Structures are given as C-alpha cells and as structure tokens.
Amino acid sequence: MTKFIESPAVKKLCELTKESYLRYWDERNGGNVSVRLEASEVEAYEDVKEVKRVLDLGFDASTLAGYYYLVTGTGRYFRNVTNQPLLDLGLVRISEDGQKAELLWGFEDGGKPTSEFASHLMSHIERLKVNPNHKVVFHCHPTNLIALSFTQSLDERHLSRLLWKMQAESIVVFPEGIGVIPYMTPGTNAIGEATAAKMAEFRAVIWPHHGLFAAGDSLDETYGLIEVIEKAAMIYSQVGTQGGKILQEITDVQLQEIAEYFNMTPHEGFLDV
C-alpha cells in the first residue's frame, strides 16, 4: 500500500498552490484551499487509518459528517507547500456530530486547518445543495480583481457585465456572473455565512479589498474559473493604461449569442436583450 502523500489529490494541490503563489495571488500566508475527497480516494492508503488529533470547528457542520477534506494549514505559505506537504496540508474527516475535524494525516508539526476553514465548510454545504458533484473551495488574492473593488461599484450586475465584456470566454466560464459581499473581517463565521449565502447562486464571490472565494467540481476547474475572472480584470486594467476609452466592445446581444452557442444561460436580468 502507498502513502497518502503520493495521492493525486496531494500532488495536484501542491502543484496549484505553487502556481498560485508564483502569480502573486497568495503572498506570505495568504490564501487557502479545501478539497472534498471520496472515501475511495482516501481509504486505499495505509497512513490515514488513525485519528491523530481532534480539532474544534466552531460551528455545526453535521450535514458534512463523515466527509473527508484535504485542506491547507493556518499561517502556512503557499510557496512552501510543495516542499513540505506533511506540515502544510492536512486530511481531516468531519465528526459524526459535525462539531469537530478528525485529523488523519498531515499537520505533523502541530498545525491546524486554515482560519477560514469554517467559511470553506459553509460554502461546501451550500454548493452541495445545488451541485452534488461539488468538491473544491479555493480562496486567493487576485491582484486586478481586488483593484476593481476599489474603483467600481460593488454591484453584482455591474461587475459581472464588466468582466463578461472583457473577453468572449468569460460568459461561457461563469454565465451566472460573480457574487459580491460587503467588506467584512476575514476569519469570522459572519463572513463565512455571507459568502455561503452567495454560493447558493454564484461559484465565485468577491471579498472587497481582499480577494476571491471560488468553488468547483475539481481543482483544475476551480483554478481555471479564477484564471478567467482575473484575466478579465487584468484586461480591464490594461485598457486603463491605454487611456481607458473603449471604442468597441462585446455587446449584450453578442454576449447572448455566445451563451446560446455554448448552451449557457446568463444570469437573469444581467443582459439588456
């Protein structure tokens, strides 16, 4: 039997945390990720059989009882994960009463899951209600998207339209648009609850002046969603450096045509068609 460190989940998470760091989306200890794993993805490994520690969650996650999550650690630097996954990552199982996380692997130096873990689990709960295949929550700090939260109205319709119009790919990748919450203190249950409420409708939620919470069926899909959103924000920033005057754009009619061609349904009321 092989070790869990050799699992596809650990290898992929090491790859993407390093890539996200290199893009300056996860400076210092910024950013966190959690991945729901099926029992079949865990139980084949010999070193995940015993509970090593039990950690309080701080809220009721009973609807996730028995679920496994691979999660990044609190205070950990994404740039280090690929070299020391046994310290910076942890595999936990949600206890039967939903109040605790049972550590099965990782965090070997006494570490704990990210301080945003409650927020992650709240979003996992909401996304699973609308998509039973949902698995990933990824939080990072995309530079150009954060900048938009200083210069643009924090209105979901406005920001979704702005990002859709920057490239033809946007409306295909996130046809529901992008959610926004007010600025809130990170790490609190309150920000987790506000984000989870938006996750019922959107797979990506802006935390103004802070970053992005994104969700998806796999690490690749979720990271790709972030890439497309940040690319659109980057194009808008580049337009600004060229004088900011837009001479031609993707029209609402053209956005609707793109969505129809790819069998996507844009968020109701976001297009003027």
List PLM regions with ranges.
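Glycine-rich flexible loops
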Residues: 1-273
